[in-house]
């Protein structure tokens, strides 16, 4: 059986500690990288229908006769720490020339009247259960326009 002399064994202890620490850091880094990749994949798949739900809900709750549609997504992110998959987003919505109950709102032009405020900015938090095709509006806060 092979063994190190006691003085050599003590000099190897810091080296072993360093290697085990490096292994833990590498594992944690790879785990975080994989988790971020999974988040990005979920965002790519589930954010578009969540945006559609947000705009649909805005139009449904709005007292305005005209439909609004998405101008740009100002910011969006996947929330952590909820039971359901949850997205928060800041959206800018523009007022269209179509009524909100018309069929083809996506192809409807925006109103461009300078005397009217035709855009509003809204913050939404929406929980989703994609396996059940269920969306729950948890927060909607809007400013400007006819919100």
Curated annotation (Swiss-Prot):
Highest rank taxon of the organism: Eukaryota
Keywords: Disulfide bond, Glycoprotein, Protease inhibitor, Secreted, Signal, Thiol protease inhibitor
Keyword Disulfide bond: yes
CDD domains in the cross-refs: CY (cd00042)
Cellular localization per UniProt: Secreted
Signal peptide from the UniProt entry: 1-28
GO BP: any one term: antimicrobial humoral response
Recorded GO MF terms: cysteine-type endopeptidase inhibitor activity
Glycan-carrying positions: 117, 139
Keyword Secreted: yes
GO CC annotations, alphabetized: extracellular space
Cysteines paired by S-S bonds: 98-108, 122-142
Assigned protein family: Belongs to the cystatin family.
Protein name listed in UniProt: Putative cystatin-9-like protein CST9LP1
Classification of source organism: Eukaryota, Metazoa, Chordata, Craniata, Vertebrata
